């Protein structure tokens, strides 16, 4: 008995329709994804702008002549301002760190946000030195110069600083990415002001400490 | 560099998954009238149902009793019980059944040689136009045999597959398999429209006896003999059809360990069958050669790729971002890949909804949710164990 065999064919119509729909959905999906991502950066940009404004307000306060205004009231206001600003800075740092891990450190929008953030931190760091002078050193300031590219102990140093910051409520830590030195005037200024040439380098209340510093060592400078 | 390769790979996998989901959805919509089987008229030629058995004491009586309640004309129904060298009382039980259903049931005993050898033993002794293979733990619906044989009115049909369902699913693991089996019924029916049925399942399939003369008997060395024979029939360009309504209930693994053992056997057998029939990967085999046949292999590779990417992200810590960054992982971390994954998930749910319209049995929404959430994890586990066993060259039996 001769058995008829199956006539094989490719269902072109359905494949072409599938391909068109798939491409359309794929493009729309990518578009929506990119939109969401750009909204994320613009949202963070807004937060940064708000922080810049706060920083500017604090700067204005330091211009007030202490002789014509009770210094304790002024210092209390400044200290409160600095504490809330430090919390915002810390959150923003964590947001940017997340974005960096998500989109990569070479992503242009992440880099631009980071430069803006570092600039703000540098300004805040300088402002704090002034407040310390005016108000009798209420804060222990730490400037931390790190690098993502040429520093094997920077991760560890970051962990030590986080632990150190947790131990003392008046410790204010500001991190500066030395890889952005050429793009940020403020980082370049600070690094030349303190003669920073390697990473990690820590400026603990004005004292320059080069190389890895553990929590115990940091504590010895705190007292 | 590695990061870019992984990203591109993820997008390729997402694109292929999206393509397949839409392909199935469109096919289901296009064939919505054909999916429902129209009565092709009664066709009940002589048929031999072969039941291979190995240590099935206490099970085989139920299987045969249920089969003998079938509305198939008894004068045309032969049942061959082939004992594959059982070490328990299976053969004695078979002899009792032979006496009880004299003229219809015949018991055979042979030396142990594996499931395929037991089926082949039966095929070589059968003289009927049609031959059915039935697992010893599967229960045939009273009308199923008639429904399946009606396909053979068309002289081009060489094999027909049944609608396999889980027998009384109670435990969660059985309920999840219940959803899987029901969805497979619809997808196999759809595949038959593309001449792309990839398996003539052991629980119940019917063959025209002449097909074995054309393509040969079951491969006694195969770990997955019901897929091997289907690939061989396809490789010879013969027609396999699939039924939506010819129900057969089968026992499924009730423990996680047993399920892993079953699926690892399927995977290992499947890999060997792919290699054996790699020539099918060609436009000469139409839709079967360019999409359905490669789909299984690509799907498995994709599962493993996603697993290794997840493993890498687990090791480099990015999978723990939630603990480091909290909820911002979700609202700041949403990207294009996640949008596409969400679309694929939604379309899959849509397909399940469309497919379920064609099934008489209702699916429990909780079981569907469990199936959707856990099945990809389970498939990954099955493949990891498969690789482990392949690398350790462990032998496997039926």
Question: Where do the PLM segments sit?
Answer:
Chain A
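A short, hydrophobic beta-strand/beta-hairpin element that forms part of a small beta-sheet core
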Residues: 161, 197-214
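Thiol-/selenol-based redox modules, centered on thioredoxin-like
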Residues: 214-223
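Sec-exported extracytoplasmic/periplasmic mature domains
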Residues: 125, 166-169, 223
């Amino acid at each position: 008995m001769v058995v008829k065999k199956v006539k094989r064919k490719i269902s072109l119509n359905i494949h072409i329709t599938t391909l068109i729909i798939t491409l359309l959905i794929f493009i729309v999906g990518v578009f929506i994804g990119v939109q969401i991502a750009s909204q994320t950066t613009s949202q963070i940009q807004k937060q940064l702008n708000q922080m810049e404004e706060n920083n500017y307000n604090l700067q204005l306060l330091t211009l007030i002549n202490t002789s014509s205004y009770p210094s304790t009231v002024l210092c209390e206001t400044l200290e409160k301002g600095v504490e809330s600003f430090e919390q915002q800075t810390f959150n923003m740092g964590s947001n940017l760190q997340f974005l960096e891990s998500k989109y990569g450190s070479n992503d242009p929008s992440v880099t631009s946000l980071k430069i803006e953030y570092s600039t703000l931190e540098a300004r805040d760091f300088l402002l704090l030195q002034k407040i310390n002078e005016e108000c009798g050193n209420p804060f222990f300031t730490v400037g931390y110069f790190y690098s993502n590219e040429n520093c094997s102990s920077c991760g560890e140093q970051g962990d030590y600083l986080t632990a150190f910051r947790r131990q003392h409520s008046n410790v204010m830590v500001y991190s500066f990415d030395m890889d952005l030195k050429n793009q940020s005037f403020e980082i370049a200024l600070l690094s030349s002001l303190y003669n920073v040439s390697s990473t990690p380098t820590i400026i603990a209340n004005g004292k320059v400490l080069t190389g890895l510093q553990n929590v115990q060592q940091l504590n010895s400078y705190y007292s | 560099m590695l990061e870019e390769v992984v990203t591109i790979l993820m997008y390729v996998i997402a694109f292929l998954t999206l393509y397949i989901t839409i392909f199935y959805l469109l096919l289901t919509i296009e064939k919505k009238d054909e999916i429902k089987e129209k009565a092709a008229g009664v066709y009940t030629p002589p048929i031999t149902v072969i039941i291979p058995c190995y240590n099935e004491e206490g099970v085989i009586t139920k299987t045969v009793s249920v089969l003998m309640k079938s509305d198939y004309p008894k004068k045309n129904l032969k049942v061959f019980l082939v004992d594959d060298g059982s070490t328990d009382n299976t053969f004695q039980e078979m002899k009792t059944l032979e006496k009880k259903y004299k003229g219809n049931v015949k018991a055979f005993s042979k030396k142990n040689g594996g499931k395929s050898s037991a089926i082949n033993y039966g095929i070589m002794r059968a003289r009927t136009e049609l031959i059915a293979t039935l697992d010893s733990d599967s229960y045939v619906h009273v009308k199923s045999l008639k429904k399946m044989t009606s396909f053979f009115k068309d002289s081009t049909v060489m094999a027909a597959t049944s609608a396999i369902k889980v027998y009384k699913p109670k435990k969660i693991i059985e309920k999840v398999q219940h959803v899987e089996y029901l969805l497979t019924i619809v997808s196999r029916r759809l595949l038959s429209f593309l001449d792309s049925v990839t398996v003539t399942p052991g629980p119940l399939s019917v063959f025209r006896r002449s097909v074995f003369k054309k393509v040969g008997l079951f491969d006694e060395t195969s770990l997955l003999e019901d897929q091997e024979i289907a690939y061989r029939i396809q490789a010879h360009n013969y027609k396999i059809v699939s039924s939506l309504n010819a129900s057969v209930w089968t026992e499924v693994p009730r423990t996680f360990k047993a399920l892993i053992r079953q699926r690892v056997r399927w995977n290992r057998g499947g890999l060997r069958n792919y290699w054996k029939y790699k020539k099918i990967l060609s436009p000469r085999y139409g839709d079967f050669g360019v999409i359905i046949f490669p789909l299984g292999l690509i799907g498995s590779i994709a599962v493993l790729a996603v697993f290794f990417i997840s493993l890498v992200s687990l090791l480099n810590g990015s999978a723990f971002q939630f603990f480091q960054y909290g909820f911002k992982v979700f609202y700041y971390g949403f990207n294009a890949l996640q949008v596409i994954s969400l679309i694929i998930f939604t379309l899959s749910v849509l397909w399940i909804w469309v497919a379920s319209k064609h099934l008489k049995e209702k699916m429990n929404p909780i079981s569907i949710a469990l199936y959707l959430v856990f099945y990809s994890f389970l498939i990954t586990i099955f493949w990891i164990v498969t690789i482990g066993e392949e690398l350790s060259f462990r032998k496997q039996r039926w």
